Amino acid sequence: MSADVPVTVAAVRAVARDVLALELRHANGQPLPGASAGAHIDLALPNGLVRQYSLVNATGQATMDCYQVAVGWDANSRGGSVWIHEKLKVGQALRVSAPRNLFEMAPEHRRVLLLAGGIGVTPIYAMAQACAQQGVDVELWASARSAPRLAYLEELKALLGQRLHLHADDEQGGPMNLTERLATQRWDAVYACGPAPMLDALTAATAHWAPGSVRMERFKGAEQPASERQPFELVLQRAGLSTTVDAHESVLDAMERVGVDFPWSCREGICGTCEAPVLEGEVQHLDYVLSPEERAEQRRMMVCVSRCGGGRLVLDI
């Protein structure tokens, strides 16, 4: 992790069906580094896993008394959410990173639509609080599979009143129709976090909007079909090493295989920890960290998911 801060679990409570909210305080009682809305922390669990969670209470403070995160139960979890839901107790000692923000709100956006799906409400709730504090004209659409799964519902109602619009899939015959609801653009920007189908629908519905007016955070990076993955040569320039990255492995896997210890956290292309400088090669970007402009520059990549489209990739490592 980029930093190592000792924390203690001060409180655990349910904020929706299968969603637990955690309050984390510095183990020594010190203030924690502050963050702006949209920021996340890396949370290191005793089972050896490191997971990223959005800060629900980050609104731009210089320091924070505590970090608040929410964790949804995931039956397909690789061990993070299951461990938290089944084993985490008040008083548990953990370690976290300093906050990072790859989903920051632009100050020039004064009319904002916030769109949350499921556990994606966590950064969106922080943004709603920040908008209220800064006098931004904000509207929030929150959706979930069923009403009991809408997290922070009472807090959002108190904060937004009639500017909060709720959608339960089981009561309304399926997911929200974004194409219909976004037919008229009344906002400077949309900020969205939720499951891939919702964000894919948002992308299609706003394809004609101005660049930079739709910003989203995904739960995991894109997956390249196995039929499109080809082996390629990897050169680590400063280390003086080269190897072949097989079709079934990532650049990060190959680096570790040849003995290079490179920082990583999510291994899903969403946290930005494993960003590496590119000297040569056609990068196939599969992350959700870099902007379209940064991707076009071909100067850096997330080695946990992105690959090389040509025969040779040279990294400044």
Swiss-Prot record:
Cross-referenced SUPFAM superfamilies: 2Fe-2S ferredoxin-like (SSF54292), Ferredoxin reductase-like, C-terminal NADP-linked domain (SSF52343), Riboflavin synthase domain-like (SSF63380)
Binding sites annotated in the UniProt record for [2Fe-2S] cluster: C266, C271, C274
Limits of the FAD-binding FR-type domain: 4-106
Gene Ontology molecular function, alphabetical: 2 iron, 2 sulfur cluster binding; metal ion binding; monooxygenase activity
UniProt domain 2Fe-2S ferredoxin-type: residue ranges: 232-317
Disulfide partners: none
Functional note: Involved in the toluene-4-sulfonate degradation pathway.
Protein name: Putative toluene-4-sulfonate monooxygenase system reductase subunit TsaB2
